[in-house]
């Protein structure tokens, strides 16, 4: 039996790729999970795997607070060392973020193999800091290589959960009818800027006969009531929505983009403007280079740039313009080219080599 510790915490972008790998592992593998008590994993992971939690945060402050953060990091590393020994862990897999620091340090101090997966087109701070300590750094996309000199890198793609690789029907609660289906994903925390931009163009889209599913996240719903509009804070039916959508409007996290790619759904991307190292902008640019997405910036006039992009993409659907192949079809092909459907297999191979 191989014993694996997965260190993944916080957002879906860190958790879901790790979950995709865990789902694909043979039953002979025993998986333990390392997370933080007040994050998404506390409600998601215990349903399937043994979850152990630690207190950890970035060392970014100054003065006394910085000293406290360093002591917390050392204590967290000690806790992970105890966990590795207690559960007889042989390999550590992490998807980056703050939790990667104590996980990688503990793995090296106990002589265990460690693999770090970086989804973004530009590697995060933890990946840049820890990459050389890892036995392998697996990348979602090739551009990240340039920022990781001296690391043992390999491009695997970013794993998506198996539900995205299966054929799914459109949920029965989604609006039905002939109009184009637009899915808006505000994210688990509720992307206020993105949601506000979308709400500014809702009347236009509904007047044109579009069907809209808006996953708002932790954000109040609009006051518009229409048979072609469904708003929900969360949904477990994202694979079915994406596979049957004509267009998705979303932030540009690497995990979400990987899901869009395997579902071959064209995207309008609104990068989160305050993301660390501007990584969402880099992700969006990478997708646009495949012709898979258009980029709209949040700082542009409210609703205007988004409406312009929508009018451009939906021209054939809205006005029946006589074109050989409309832009949405070309973008769908771009997403297909960007997709890596067997990323979980590549990562499993790395784990098996290390075991």
UniProtKB/Swiss-Prot annotation:
Its main location: membrane. Its EC number is 2.4.1.227. It is a peripheral membrane protein. Pathway: Cell wall biogenesis; peptidoglycan biosynthesis. InterPro entries: GlcNAc_MurG, Glyco_trans_28_C, GlycoTrans_28_N. It is an enzyme of class 2 (transferase). It is found in: Cell inner membrane. The keyword Nucleotide-binding does not apply. It comes from the Bacteria. One of its GO terms (molecular function) is UDP-N-acetyl-D-glucosamine:N-acetylmuramoyl-L-alanyl-D-glutamyl-meso-2,6-diaminopimelyl-D-alanyl-D-alanine-diphosphoundecaprenol 4-beta-N-acetylglucosaminlytransferase activity. The keyword Cell division applies. It catalyses: di-trans,octa-cis-undecaprenyl diphospho-N-acetyl-alpha-D-muramoyl-L-alanyl-D-glutamyl-meso-2,6-diaminopimeloyl-D-alanyl-D-alanine + UDP-N-acetyl-alpha-D-glucosamine = di-trans,octa-cis-undecaprenyl diphospho-[N-acetyl-alpha-D-glucosaminyl-(1->4)]-N-acetyl-alpha-D-muramoyl-L-alanyl-D-glutamyl-meso-2,6-diaminopimeloyl-D-alanyl-D-alanine + UDP + H(+). UDP-N-acetyl-alpha-D-glucosamine binds at residues 11-13, 120, 161, 188, 280. SUPFAM superfamilies: UDP-Glycosyltransferase/glycogen phosphorylase (SSF53756). Keywords: Cell cycle, Cell division, Cell inner membrane, Cell membrane, Cell shape, Cell wall biogenesis/degradation, Glycosyltransferase, Membrane, Peptidoglycan synthesis, Transferase. Pfam families: Glyco_tran_28_C, Glyco_transf_28. One of its GO terms (biological process) is regulation of cell shape. One of its GO terms (cellular component) is plasma membrane. Cell wall formation. Catalyzes the transfer of a GlcNAc subunit on undecaprenyl-pyrophosphoryl-MurNAc-pentapeptide (lipid intermediate I) to form undecaprenyl-pyrophosphoryl-MurNAc-(pentapeptide)GlcNAc (lipid intermediate II). Belongs to the glycosyltransferase 28 family. MurG subfamily. HAMAP family: MurG (MF_00033). This is UDP-N-acetylglucosamine--N-acetylmuramyl-(pentapeptide) pyrophosphoryl-undecaprenol N-acetylglucosamine transferase. It comes from Prochlorococcus marinus (strain MIT 9211).
